[in-house]
Amino acid sequence: MEEGDFSGSEPSEVTDGQNTNTTMTTETHTTTEHQPKPLVVRLLEVHNCDEDEEDEEEEQEEDHEAPKTHKSHEASVSFKSVNSSDSPKASDLPLSCKASDFLGSSKASDPSESFKALQSSESQEDVKDDLFSNAVIRTSPSLMTGYPPQLQLTSLRAHPATRDLVKKCFYSRKRVQDLSRPKKQWGTPDRRLFWGNQEPIRPVSEAALKAPSSKRIEDLAQPRLVSRHYVPNRVQYYYSCGRDSVIWEIPPPALITQPSKRIQKLAKPNRFKTQSLINRENLPGTLRYSDPSPRILRLSIAKGTDPNYIPPKTIQTKISFSTLSAVASPRIVDLAHPRIKIEGLCYERERSELPIRPVAPAALLANPSERTIFLAKSKRVHEDYLPVRDARWPISYAATHPQVSERIQELANPHTRSPTHVVYYDPDVFKVKPSALKAHCSNRVKELAEPIVR
């Protein structure tokens, strides 16, 4: 599509439904080279058309309904292309004046009244559209290309509710961007903290910041002079804020040197303070230290060793000089070496029937003596020895199939006790029968009474 197509204008026709063909041509010359009028010029034109408003309203009432409809449609087109048109016609001036009047009335009145007026104007336009349902509107392409993409001021003036919504959305964009960012972790500072960049807890006054320092403060602010003979043996930190402390390293000569007698004397603690020794003579007699008695002096002497005391023998073994100077023979040196095993702990087996360790042929052919045979036999167990019983042992058939006698049933019944509310004393409770005193236990009872020896 070329630029020449948009330079021309196409006529816009409106046809009513009462078989009346009325053609009105509106030519608007809008090109990309022409710029819209400034805002000040358009405001002056609106102000000038306020005076002729009454005359034009009377003329509009006398006109036919068809021109009214044409004007309404033409007003909608001219309202959308106010900024794009250079020379508006006389028919467009009343409509622009009406828009300015509507804007002024909306500023003077409440927002609710302006909104009602806007609804009434929209309802009138809907009624007109219903009356002329067969109307056809044609718009030239030049108007479409000349319309700027941004929002027009006239549209915002005609609709105050839309203007407030646009302002609200425009100013809330920064808030939406702030909320879209991720939250920072609580407690983490925005910047790294170093010594000297923290804000004070209490604000410093301007007088304190502007106060001149005295000569004494300047002298105290100077660092202490260090002797040229001083050699630091650790890392020097003026401020230890945020740094680890350094342990002093002790040089090796300090560990080897011995202190002098003077240093040893000064290292000992004083038994009494000097002031207490001076004031000691002025103390009363009750507080003075008394001299030791002869008994205390005698007890303070350590006891001597008894003349008949024999000290313990020394455990140290005395080795003779000849033993220390003896020279071992080659055979003794050979026997002193540990026995070397083949392949660690096992020996090579020639045949499977041979033992793991090889046996000498002389040992296999040797005849043992009677003493060796006697010692080779294992010791016998004592006749009364009972082997340790297993944790689980089989239960006999008689124990698994018992038959309860009448006596056992009688003993199985619980003992009947007399009621507690009846007081009964038996005088012969602890009396032993004479027959029980003269009874003799049988050998079987004695045997059962003895514990089993395991």
Curated annotation (Swiss-Prot):
THEG repeat coordinates: 167-185, 207-226, 253-272, 286-305, 322-341, 362-381, 398-417, 435-454
InterPro entries for this protein: SPMAP2-like, THEG
Region (Disordered): 1-129
Composition bias type Acidic residues, residue spans: 50-64
Stated name of the protein: Sperm microtubule associated protein 2-like
PANTHER family recorded: TESTICULAR HAPLOID EXPRESSED GENE PROTEIN, TESTICULAR HAPLOID EXPRESSED GENE PROTEIN-LIKE
Organism whose genome encodes this protein: Rattus norvegicus
SMART domains per the UniProt record, alphabetical: THEG
Keyword flag Repeat: yes
Domain of life where this protein originates: Eukaryota
Compositional bias annotation for Low complexity: 19-29, 76-87
Keywords annotated in UniProt: Repeat
Pfam families assigned: THEG (PF14912)
Bias (Polar residues): 9-18, 106-122
Basic and acidic residues bias: start-end ranges: 65-74
